[in-house]
Amino acid sequence: MKKIECACNFLMDKDAQGYIDLSDLDLTSCHFKGDVISKVSFLSSNLQHVTFECKEIGDCNFTTAIVDNVIFRCRRLHNVIFIKASGECVDFSKNILDTVDFSQSQLGHSNFRECQIRNSNFDNCYLYASHFTRAEFLSAKEISFIKSNLTAVMFDYVRMSTGNFKDCITEQLELTIDYSDIFWNEDLDGYINNIIKMIDTLPDNAMILKSVLAVKLVMQLKILNIVNKNFIENMKKIFSHCPYIKDPIIRSYIHSDEDNKFDDFMRQHRFSEVNFDTQQMIDFINRFNTNKWLIDKNNNFFIQLIDQALRSTDDMIKANVWHLYKEWIRSDDVSPIFIETEDNLRTFNTNELTRNDNIFILFSSVDDGPVMVVSSQRLHDMLNPTKDTNWNSTYIYKSRHEMLPVNLTQETLFSSKSHGKYALFPIFTASWRAHRIMNKGV
């Protein structure tokens, strides 16, 4: 209590500029309580565990102050300076921070939850593991975090349309934006363009975060059916140099004409022979990756794409199409539905067939090529490089009446050299539920 009384006595002393001078003092655990705290200098003071309980703090200076565990139970901080202030676990939660300069401060593990932040500066700050959950950055002026350490900082569902994150440290940074300001926004173009610019200011080592933010923005615009040439052109310009421009969700929004071309091309060639060029392979693989339901509607098209892409000389195309194929094959968890009836004969285990089982009919892409009936579990095993699976004497059908045994390995299945023009690869699978097989046969 003595320290509190002592601190209050200092409030009576003002300097020539009308400021109350509380500089270079040990004010540990003081409790400042009142209506308005105005024109007070806490320059280089020790404010550890201090509580400010008032309606407003205005025109105050906390430069180089020690502020560990300081609590600001205020409605508003206006025109306040925290330059080079240092301390952890400072609580600004639910305050209005209006024209507050935090530049060069060290405020790790601090709490900015649900703050309304206007015209404030966070340049060169150390904000390790601080929380801005549901904070609102409301100023028309850009909120700046240039060169700040934002490691493990949580910007969770923040309302934010302007910001500069240039040269920040962003390891483990989490940033999600509340897009509620899209609704009834009189300057929607400006709002969207500012967000696009803000995303672009994030450093290149935060590419995954930039990608997520860009995709979520585009998804929000697509859900609301907001299409505007102005900010679409801005996206093309700003995002064009970044890898996430290739994300199918973004491309389908800013290059919607490409989707139409894809759909038209696929419809036209659904039942005909197609020779894909390199760019078509890339585009169509991306399209199927994001819209796997298209596969069942475009089986012939998909067969040929898989075939030609796996034979491509482009390693990236081969890797992407192999990933697409494996993901698609593994999309259903299915039990084995074959039993051994003789040494080299497998047949359907009808006792094991359920409505949830899939039987895959596997085709070669060449004319009159072999066809195989197999359970998806066999394919799962085949595609598992860590599992030593014996594929001897699986029955391959060149027709319903002619059976040819073959040793089915990854080499015989996917290497065009092993069977010449009758190579078994690619597996193209059309899956039928087991009850269809039982009803219709194979």
UniProtKB/Swiss-Prot annotation:
Q: Which SUPFAM superfamilies match?
A: Pentapeptide repeat-like
Looking up Pfam families in the UniProt record yields: Pentapeptide, SopA
Mention any additional remark: The sdgG mutation, which suppresses a conditional mutation in dnaG (DNA primase), has been localized to one of the ubiA, ubiC or yjbI genes.
List the protein's name.
Answer: Putative protein YjbI
- The organism of origin for this protein: Escherichia coli (strain K12)
Name of the coding gene? yjbI
